[in-house]
């Protein structure tokens, strides 16, 4: 099962969802429950006894039905309660690491049916989610708050480091002093920020409606990440290389592999060797030019396709810009924008 499978389950039991409301009723009452989400022929084969309910789901109804010993079966979107008080008999050949009867049955049923199963422990007062070989215990609100706070601080720190790295890179680009190592270090930081933001997404799903404030903070930190990375990659990879393929390669690296900058250099089309670190490399100019609001994407493409890099673009005369149909107003905005960018970065240092 994939991370997406885990997220799909968490969404169904996140605070604010109808199913979670019913689960909370069950937890507060100090009773347990086993809930199977979805029904098909395979579920019918493992269903023994119980009785047909076939009514609309409400938190109150599932709470009342959980007072009986058997499992509860819901439809795929949890909008209907199909069966209650069911004895579930999954194939015992499926292994389980659980100790309690309810959780052993839940884990085996999830593996057998390839469906989502929710087990609520009356003794430990916790909720465990299963699907296939996937198993995940929901954290309580206090645990989540602590962990989210830690991850959010890490994201803020890494985003700050990335921003400083991009500022330094901008000055190097304008002075024509960029090396392969400078670019690889920045690309490495982009991927680190992306991974931390993906990690916090799972926490936000688990927080559900309680995570609105954190969600706003995360959105503020990463709102321009994709666009900034796209411009950055277009500056340094050759025209035949797809930016998505670079991202896929970086995503395939383990955390420890990502920390080795030699692996990141490969994404830029260089050999996996430190000997290339000091090689000079020039930015085409996408990232810098796209920060100048008066230039359209068409203008940026025209300039980048005409001149080889941002260093050369700074030396182009007004007449040469006019020759490629860049207006005097935009030429002035371009020059002022680059000077303002330099000044702003220097003031922030």
From Swiss-Prot:
PROSITE patterns: DAC (PS51794)
Listed cofactors: Mg(2+)
Entry EC no(s): 2.7.7.85
Keyword terms of this UniProt record: ATP-binding, DNA damage, DNA repair, DNA-binding, Magnesium, Nucleotide-binding, Nucleotidyltransferase, Transferase
GO biological process: DNA repair
Highest taxon listed in the record's lineage: Bacteria
Keyword Transferase: yes
Domain DAC: 3-143
Gene Ontology molecular functions: adenylate cyclase activity; ATP binding; diadenylate cyclase activity; DNA binding
Substrates-to-products reaction catalysed: 2 ATP = 3',3'-c-di-AMP + 2 diphosphate
A Pfam family annotated for this UniProt entry: DAC
Signal peptide: none
SUPFAM superfamilies registered for this protein in UniProt: YojJ-like (SSF143597)
Binding site for ATP: 70, 88, 101-105
Stored InterPro entries: DisA (IPR050338), DisA_sf (IPR038331), DNA_integrity_DisA_N_sf (IPR036888), DNA_integrity_scan_DisA_link (IPR018906), DNA_integrity_scan_DisA_N (IPR003390), DNA_integrity_scanning_protein (IPR023763)
The keyword Repeat is assigned to this record: no
PANTHER family, sorted: DIADENYLATE CYCLASE (PTHR34185), DNA INTEGRITY SCANNING PROTEIN DISA (PTHR34185:SF3)
Functional summary from the UniProt entry: Participates in a DNA-damage check-point. DisA forms globular foci that rapidly scan along the chromosomes searching for lesions.
Family: Belongs to the DisA family.
Cited NCBIfam families: PRK13482.1
Subunit structure: Homooctamer.
Designated name of the protein: DNA integrity scanning protein DisA
Species per Swiss-Prot/TrEMBL record: Fusobacterium nucleatum subsp. nucleatum (strain ATCC 25586 / DSM 15643 / BCRC 10681 / CIP 101130 / JCM 8532 / KCTC 2640 / LMG 13131 / VPI 4355)
Native organism taxonomy: Bacteria, Fusobacteriati, Fusobacteriota, Fusobacteriia, Fusobacteriales
